[in-house]
Amino acid sequence: MSSLSRFLLRGNFSFSTHTNRRFFSAVTAAAATPSPPKPSLITLVNDERDPKFITEKFKKACQAEWFRKNIAVYERTVRRLAAAKKFEWVEEILEEQNKYPNMSKEGFVARIINLYGRVGMFENAQKVFDEMPERNCKRTALSFNALLNACVNSKKFDLVEGIFKELPGKLSIEPDVASYNTLIKGLCGKGSFTEAVALIDEIENKGLKPDHITFNILLHESYTKGKFEEGEQIWARMVEKNVKRDIRSYNARLLGLAMENKSEEMVSLFDKLKGNELKPDVFTFTAMIKGFVSEGKLDEAITWYKEIEKNGCRPLKFVFNSLLPAICKAGDLESAYELCKEIFAKRLLVDEAVLQEVVDALVKGSKQDEAEEIVELAKTNDYLQCKLRLFPKE
């Protein structure tokens, strides 16, 4: 009998009888058959709602080797526990991995380090990295990069540069382009943009080649932080070095142009990305909408909004945060009303404050029935519960 089965038969599992039966069936089947019903066991973990039971189910499921190979279920479980503020249980399920032979494999350990980093638990990530030699697990650029990523994702920006300078020489690790890219991201995070840009030359001096990720980090940092001229210089260097620009490169520049009210140049750049056979995504259209809204060109902004769905994308709430207040301010209450109805009909996300702004505008514009309808839709829909006031605050 497998250890999983013995555990369950002892009666220590604190779930409901129905849940016990389902979990027992899945785990014993996983242990007894050559081809385990993987989706069933994963589903049992994913479908659980109680953080305590998520933790217990996950730990027991980890006894199946194939389950430990599933990256997605680890990421989802850690994310859900962190969202519930149960960081002690994040630590519990990741510490549980120490009992398995996977922890002697660098790829698996790098995953654990990254998972800690994604939820801001850098000290735990550092501990896992430091303990690798005890498990006869060699540390290379793979785990080093995971540690750097954990540091950046945990927003420990002041520590990134020190780790980068200290560990490679100490552990005989040769940083690669991915290492430098993470360092660049960390420097940008602490506001050291000039030092981050200077690393392009250092990368090349090391015999490495900056890639599109290197430049995309710098493009995003410059264009989104109001450093338009610096962004244009980075873009020019990218072209000069013949680094292929992807949709993220174009999106960053489009946003920069939008913030500078350069709608004509935005349209020209959009045509270029299409000419380069790149597929625009929702962020592309969000930037276009933002630019036209900023210039007060609402008809054009609405036209670009309609392009989102035509291109197989779903609008993000940032689109409505930009578009709806502008439409209300322009006095086009009918369009604002219709757009709100579309949001609920298509189950799209929007901030409650933006919806309230529309309701207030409708009431002030003597469109009481329309305002009441939006309030009712916000109250009765089954995916986005909002408590809207029918009358504006005085």
Curated annotation (Swiss-Prot):
Q: Where is the transit peptide, renumbered to this chain?
A: 1-24
* Annotated compartments: Mitochondrion
GO function terms (MF aspect)? mRNA binding
Keyword terms: Mitochondrion, Repeat, Ribonucleoprotein, Ribosomal protein, Transit peptide
Q: Where are the PPR repeats?
A: 105-139, 140-170, 176-210, 211-245, 246-280, 281-315, 316-350, 351-385
Stored Pfam families: PPR, PPR_2
Xref: InterPro entries: Mito_RNA_Proc_CCM1 (IPR051114), Pentatricopeptide_rpt (IPR002885), TPR-like_helical_dom_sf (IPR011990)
Say which domain of life the source belongs to: Eukaryota
Gene3D superfamilies in the record? Tetratricopeptide repeat domain (1.25.40.10)
What would be one Gene Ontology cellular-component term for the protein? Answer: mitochondrion
Family under the similarity heading: Belongs to the PPR family. P subfamily.
* Oligomeric form and interacting partners: Component of the mitochondrial ribosome small subunit.
- Protein name, per record: Small ribosomal subunit protein mS79 (rPPR3b)
Q: Which organism is it from?
A: Arabidopsis thaliana
Tell me the lineage of the source organism: Eukaryota, Viridiplantae, Streptophyta, Embryophyta, Tracheophyta
